[in-house]
Amino acid sequence: MASAWKVKDPTVAERTVVVSGLPVGLLKDQLVKCYFQDEGGHVEEVIYPSKSKGVAYIIFKEKKVAQDFIRQKKHPPGSEPRLTVSHFSEKVFNYVMAILDLSVFRTQIELESLVVDLKKKIPTLNFSPLGPSGKISVQGSFLAIMKLKQALISKAISPLENNRKDAGERRNWNGENPRRILQKRENSASILGTFVAEPAGSPETLVLDTDIFLYLKHKCEFYHLTLSKYHVLCQERVDGDVTTICLQDAQDGSCSGSVRHVKEFIEECAQEFHLELRKELLVLEGMGDREKRNIRQALEELGGRYPRVLTNVHSTHIDLIGPPSDTYLFKTQLMKSAGQKVT
């Protein structure tokens, strides 16, 4: 996987193009790789297959050729025009690896059958062989891991709730703007006159990618307005890349259903942000004091110019999180401020 880490080099990243939606299969993998390597001698390396299914990383010898390739949006012969061609940019959350202990399900179902069922429900996940103790490692996107979590929770509680017809109620995600989602929920609530009755004071817990949660908290005013409007208290626990949120009714159950209402709203916003946001990384290591001072000054000046970009300053690097175009331009301006060449 040495070539995969090569993309992390800033000088390589700017010459790298990401092509997603490619066909998966041994013969198809070979055809795709041969096709992209035959780009008039301009390709330095093709990383395919990669950790992400159907995603290829094309490293060109020159940045300009990579930019031209993106503009032309070339596709392999015979493929459907559903491929996504974009400049390499580290996603807010690329992939997650989790170790599961499925032994608790032995009394309900054969564990091998459970794994087969999970693979069918969430095909984007990669599963390791099932261990004799019932443990298995799983790797995939953050959203896929969260779907897996919900599937396992439903499997665990289903024997206790067979008589509850609404236990498995699902939400329809349609990619609406968060403010429109909230307005839609408010309209539904006003028509019904009240929320569906729930046990008073029942807290709700959800898990979010830390970068997405910080963006929601610091860049989205409606997040705080929603908590206040529905009288919901929020307790946060940040643990590296994952943040756990506990929501609880601040009025001791006087507004039944408000906690779940807020939880579903936050989950839908987080899903939208996961698809829309990108993270750019500016490495500070190796910079002199003058360069770092210029970076800090530029951060203050550019903050007002790019209000949709969240900046997290660390001792070794700066995270820029926001819409792809804004984060890229923000990073470009910071590099210029540090005296680094931007081509």
Swiss-Prot record:
Residues 15-90 form the RRM domain. Transmembrane segments: none annotated. The keyword Cell inner membrane does not apply. Keywords: RNA-binding. This is RNA-binding protein 43. GO terms for molecular function: RNA binding. The keyword Kinase does not apply. It comes from Mus musculus (Mouse). SUPFAM superfamilies: RNA-binding domain, RBD. Signal peptide: none annotated. InterPro entries: Nucleotide-bd_a/b_plait_sf, RBD_domain_sf, RRM_dom.
